[in-house]
């Protein structure tokens, strides 16, 4: 089964821009959520996953979703 990546980003975050570009370069299935106008949702994600920076990158494979981390974690995951 194909992997699907989900990115939670903020527009003006340099690492978010780089993560977004990375999924486009890789040509992987992905969904991007821009959270600039959704501070409550961003706060919920940070608290639930105990991960306090953006981007927040997730991968879903075989029906299981896991947090990869941020931009550098995504690049390492692709390698």
Language-model features and meaning:
Residues 14, 36, 75:
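Nucleotide phosphate-binding site architecture
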Residues 9, 28-42, 52:
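Thiol-based oxidoreductase modules, predominantly thioredoxin-like and allied folds used
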Residues 1-30:
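Local sequence-structure signature of Cys/Sec-based thiol-disulfide redox active-site neighborhoods
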Residues 59-79:
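Non-catalytic, surface beta->alpha helical segment in thiol-disulfide oxidoreductase systems
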